[in-house]
Design a protein with these regions (language model features):
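Positively charged n-region of N-terminal signal peptides that target proteins for export
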Residues: 1-4, 19
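Acidic, polar-rich low-complexity tracts and alpha-helical solenoid repeat scaffolds
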Residues: 18-605
Length: 605
């Protein structure tokens, strides 16, 4: 009995091994055939695919590849006979008509090809189950109109089928944005769950230019749908569109409409406000935060909105800023819920009011009440900034180092590392600054990574070689003085590079690597002092020396803004906005330049 059981076990085991070996052989053959096919070795691929198809005649992948191999080797008759034989054995496999049609298409027999395509489409009325396969084949053969017809036929005969997504993608391939957007919108209309998917695909066509053809068509499609079939989702999409176009006030209007219908959630408005603030659209941002303050019952949400209102007051130099902060502390107190407001207030005291000691006291009090290590880190970051402002570098570096130790790999630790690099740069310790910046170039936070790369390149491009002065030490010191709001001293430091012969034998002249950076910093300081014409002179000198500088689009935008907002020279403003539009189409200033140029030209909004 034991021997019989052992024999059965060995037999079954042998069969299993043989089966696994056979499957492995098939997989290896399929991989080899596919490799030959992709490399264009169609004769070799044909032999293997034929063997695979003969052993698995129901495998449509093998069939498709075999037919394609026959076509690529001009064996059209063999392909035709194979397909007709397959159809003869099963007339329900209507996708075979597409193969047959394309077989004639490859032979330039257009009319014959169309006959088979029509048969395939008509056959779907009786066999809609093959609709997806037929449409997919049409798409693969770039027969996009036929693919759309196939999907629509299936949907007409099967009310549960929904191929609007596939249809929309095909319209996109055809460049028919109107139909594409209509199909995507229909998909959302049928089921809101498609929202994120559709938004992701639509974003491939939407730009930040409100005059972009796709943007206009998408907006019109949404407005038509909103009128014929009102749904909250259309407002959400319009809000998203306006946000992409930096039309934040219009986005707010859509969110207000949603809020009026369903009061409660203000997170979208808070997000729009923050984006507008970061993008320097302060009026629109203020509208968002004012609305939250007026409508929200959530204390934390209200405090957050007030924080940004205070930040806007600081950046726009509102004379009532001090009063605004004091009122906030009267209403909400100085506690853990207002820590960010306390940090913002300390920043205001230091960099706007030149009261760093008072700011230091505010932050020391905040630090004593903070319980979260993240809150403590934020406070220490600002304390470090204030200590640098006061020239107490070593104490500042201690705070920054503490954050790095306590919050390893966190965004705040990366920010602290950048502060270490920046402080080291200010001190003239360029090697240590570069060591920190090398680590940060791969930062997960894009803004920190960008700042790190910019500072690293500034040091690398301008640092002294073989102890020969390069002016970098003087530039770093001028930047420190500017950070400390000692603008006149900073300008004096920079002017010495042009006048004195200590660093450059002939003074700083075009051709020196540091020339652009020095003039650019001078221009920014002169703008701050409202010496706009002098700033224009400095910026123009950079362009004269090198109009291909990486600063060129920054310079053009700065000049356009000065002419537009401060010197009231609309003609010159248009000239420089236009330079960005036509000479720097990938510039971060493109959207604003285009909008402002159109406004100055008198275009209707």
């Amino acid at each position: 009995m034991t021997k019989i059981i052992l024999l059965i076990f060995l037999t079954v085991n042998s069969l299993g091994i043989a089966q696994n070996t056979a499957q492995q052989t098939v997989q290896n053959d399929a991989r080899l055939a596919e490799t030959y096919y992709r490399e264009g070795a169609y004769e070799k691929a044909t032999q293997i695919f034929k063997k695979l198809y003969d052993s698995s005649p129901f495998n449509t992948t093998y069939l498709g590849r075999l037919v394609s191999c026959y076509q690529e080797t001009n064996q059209f008759l063999i392909a035709e006979n194979l397909l007709k034989s397959k159809l003869k054995s099963n007339k329900n496999e209507v996708y075979l008509y597409v193969y047959l049609g394309y077989n004639h298409e490859k032979q330039q027999q257009k009319e014959k090809a169309q006959e088979y395509y029509k048969i395939a489409l008509i056959s779907l009325e009786k066999n809609p189950t093959y609709g997806r396969v037929v449409a997919r084949l049409f798409t693969d053969y770039n027969l996009l109109d036929e693919a759309i017809l196939a999907y629509k036929k299936v949907m007409a005969f099967n009310e549960h089928a929904n191929y609007n997504f596939q249809i929309a993608q095909i319209y996109g391939e055809k460049g028919n944005f109107k139909k594409m957007f209509e199909s995507y919108i229909d998909l959302i209309a049928s089921n809101d769950q498609y929202f994120n998917l559709v938004q992701r695909y639509i974003s491939q066509y939407i730009t930040d230019d409100s005059e972009n053809k796709a943007n206009i068509l998408f907006k019109k499609t949404l407005l038509r749908k909103s009128a014929s079939n009102p749904k909250d989702v259309w407002n959400t999409l319009l809000s998203w569109l306006f946000t992409q176009q930096k039309e934040y006030s219009k986005a707010l209007l859509q969110e207000k409409a949603l809020f009026q219908r369903k009061p409660g959630n203000l997170s979208a408005i808070l997000t729009i406000g923050k984006i507008a603030f970061e993008d320097n659209y302060f009026a629109a941002a203020q509208q968002c935060f004012n609305f939250i303050v007026a409508q929200s019952n959530n204390k934390s949400e209200v405090i957050n909105a007030h924080l940004y209102i205070a930040k806007i007051a600081v950046v726009t130099k509102n004379p009532e800023t001090e009063t605004l902060f004091q009122n906030l502390f009267k209403i909400f107190g100085k506690n853990t819920s207002t820590l960010k407001i306390q940090v913002a207030y300390a920043d205001f005291l230091t960099f706007s009011q030149n009261k760093p000691r008072q700011a230091n006291i505010v932050l020391e009090e905040a630090l004593s009440s903070a319980s979260s290590k993240f809150d403590k880190a934020r406070i220490k970051l600002k304390l470090g900034d204030i200590l640098v402002y006061r020239g107490k570098f070593n104490k500042a570096l201690i705070y920054f180092s503490q954050i790095q130790t306590q919050l390893k790999n966190h965004e705040l630790a990366q920010e602290a590392r950048f502060k270490v690099a920046q402080t080291s740069y200010f001190k003239g310790d360029f090697d240590w600054a570069k060591a920190q910046l090398k680590v940060l170039k791969g930062s997960t936070t894009q803004l920190i990574a960008n700042d790190a790369v910019a500072l690293f390149l500034k040091i690398s491009d301008n640092e002294p070689v073989d102890s020969i002065p390069s002016g970098l030490k003087q530039l770093a010191n001028a930047e420190l003085l500017a950070f400390q709001n000692k603008d006149e001293a900073a300008l004096t430091e920079l002017n010495r590079l042009f006048i004195e012969k200590k660093v450059f034998i002939n003074g700083l002249i075009p051709g020196e690597v540091i020339y652009d950076d020095v003039l650019f910093l001078q221009a920014k300081l002169l703008i701050k002092q409202k010496k706009y014409k002098e700033a224009i002179v400095r910026l123009s000198k950079i362009i004269e020396a090198d109009n291909q500088s990486f600063l060129t689009d920054d310079i053009y935008f700065m000049m356009a803004e000065i002419y537009d907002n401060d010197l009231n020279n609309t003609e010159k403003a248009q000239e420089y906005y236009q330079k960005i539009i036509f000479e720097h189409p990938s510039s971060i200033y493109l959207v604003d330049a285009r909008k402002k140029y159109r406004k100055l030209r008198g275009d209707k909004a």
